[in-house]
Amino acid sequence: MAPDISKKRLPCKVLVFNLPPTLPEQVFLQSINSFLPHVEWHRFSKGKATVGTRSELLSFAYLKFQSATAVQEFFRVYQGHTFIDKKNNTYRAIVTIAPYQKIPPSKVKADSLEGSLEQDPKFQEFKVQRESYSQTASNDDVIEKLQTSTPLLQYLAEKKNAVVEKGKSKPSKKSVKAKKKLRLAEKPASNNSKAGKSSQESKKSSKAPAESAAAVIKEDKVSDRKKSKKKPKKTPVSNSTASQASENASDKKTKEKKSSGKQKIASKKKDQLTTDNV
């Protein structure tokens, strides 16, 4: 849409977009050749064609005209200008008013201080001090100044020295390992000696109750022998008990005789029966 001339401040910067992505800048300038005398500034941005899955980026251009009448004429002539690329794709140019009307300055302001370093008084003083310092100062002085220590550096140095001294006083790992080996070698010998002593003590302790038990057994045997050697006292037998014993003995003898006679009679009867049957 063309700008209105009745406005006090007329926009003169124009944006032309929807141009082919492969359009060269020279071809675009040739298409606006009749308007170039009225253009005081321009910028062209070339697009990119499709590559793989990437979509194309269209080209665009900014034009700054000298007057509003030239802008209106450009809108009337160039709006919808057609371009055809190699693949027969058609593109129609679209002309609009640029949203930002300012343009970068054509001339860069020169710095007033450029090339004036040698005339600067502070720089000259620095040069003089450096020359005098290089002439008077020697390497030893510089080293001494560099080696000046602060309380913090002194504290760190003392701490480091203390750590080094502790490390020297501590035995090395090899000596510690050797001492451990000696201790391990001494332990079995001491254990063996302790075991020998304990075994001897246990033997002695076991012998003591055995000896006491043997002594008790001997005493019992001696006492039994003494008892067996002693003769038992004969108890006096009365006349009544003696007569009863003799009667009992005679009764047993008569009973035995009777039983033997009965057995003989039974055996004789068996012999007779056997002879009769034959």
From Swiss-Prot:
Keywords tagged on the record: Nonsense-mediated mRNA decay, Nucleus
Protein species of origin: Schizosaccharomyces pombe (strain 972 / ATCC 24843) (Fission yeast)
GO cellular component entries: cytoplasm; nucleolus
Organism domain of life: Eukaryota
Compositional bias ranges of the Basic residues kind: 169-182
Listed transmembrane segments: none
Family classification: Belongs to the RENT3 family.
Composition bias type Low complexity, residue spans: 207-216
Name under which the protein is recorded: Nonsense-mediated mRNA decay protein 3
Region of interest (Disordered), residue spans: 163-278
Entry GO MF terms: mRNA binding
BP GO terms, sorted: nuclear-transcribed mRNA catabolic process, 3'-5' exonucleolytic nonsense-mediated decay; nuclear-transcribed mRNA catabolic process, nonsense-mediated decay; positive regulation of translation
Location in or out of the cell: Nucleus, Nucleolus
Biased composition (Basic and acidic residues): 249-259, 268-278
Biological role: Involved in nonsense-mediated decay of mRNAs containing premature stop codons.
Primary subcellular site in the record, as a coarse category: nucleus
Family matches, as Gene3D superfamilies: 3.30.70.330
